[in-house]
């Protein structure tokens, strides 16, 4: 399960040749945070600020996003939370610099980062939803996941056992195909990312100390 990641940077955005993102977003994202989503509209590729975690039309409590940030590709059609989006082929991508997973060392979880070796951003497959709650338009999205028990890198993460999951990475040369896909059958996209193009390393959270008035971090 991926619950934490860093969105792409401005330099990575420019390297991909994508249009400017017209809103601000956090350097690091967790469930129920806002994040940038790329999708295809009738006008072409567009950015939207969405909630990380699917908020279906029937949900009364927006905090459901804390539980719906990942969606198993195997059960998308069976889960009420994701049915509407998969049936209407609301496919998007979440461009990221790196994402984080828990690796258990001596039965204790450590935070590890996964990223491309070449430093480029990459696209994580997503489903999105748009619904109205009162006078508010709510936009949200979830990362689609796959079984990773046979993936050389991703099988090392998560709690010990036989359940291993991974996000689905959409190759750069299949981006347009994914965003324009018109079928609920997405099996042709369910593939583990090429291990030789990625790397991972221990990435402990940095504790932010209380800022002293005497310190100037811009010097």
Predicted regions located by residue number:
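Short linear sequence motif anchored by a di-proline
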Residues: 1-219
């Amino acid at each position: 399960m991926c619950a934490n990641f860093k969105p792409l940077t401005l330099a990575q955005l420019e390297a991909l040749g994508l249009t400017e993102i017209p809103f601000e977003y956090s350097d690091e994202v967790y469930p129920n945070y806002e994040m940038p989503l790329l999708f295809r509209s009738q006008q072409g590729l567009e950015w939207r600020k969405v909630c990380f975690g699917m908020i279906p039309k029937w949900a009364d409590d927006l905090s459901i996003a804390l539980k719906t940030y990942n969606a198993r590709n195997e059960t998308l059609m069976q889960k009420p939370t994701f049915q509407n989006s998969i049936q209407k082929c609301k496919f998007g991508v979440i461009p990221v610099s790196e994402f984080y997973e828990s690796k258990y060392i001596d039965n204790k979880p450590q935070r590890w980062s996964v990223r491309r070796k070449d430093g480029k951003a990459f696209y994580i497959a997503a489903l999105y939803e748009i619904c109205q709650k009162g006078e508010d338009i709510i936009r949200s999205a979830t990362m689609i996941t796959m079984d990773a028990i046979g993936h050389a890198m991703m099988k090392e993460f998560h709690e010990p056992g036989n359940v291993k999951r991974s996000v689905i990475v959409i190759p750069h040369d299949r981006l347009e195909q994914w965003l324009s896909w018109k079928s609920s059958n997405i099996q042709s996209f369910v593939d583990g990312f090429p291990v030789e193009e990625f790397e991972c390393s221990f990435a402990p959270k940095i504790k932010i100390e209380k800022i002293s008035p005497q310190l100037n971090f811009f010097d």
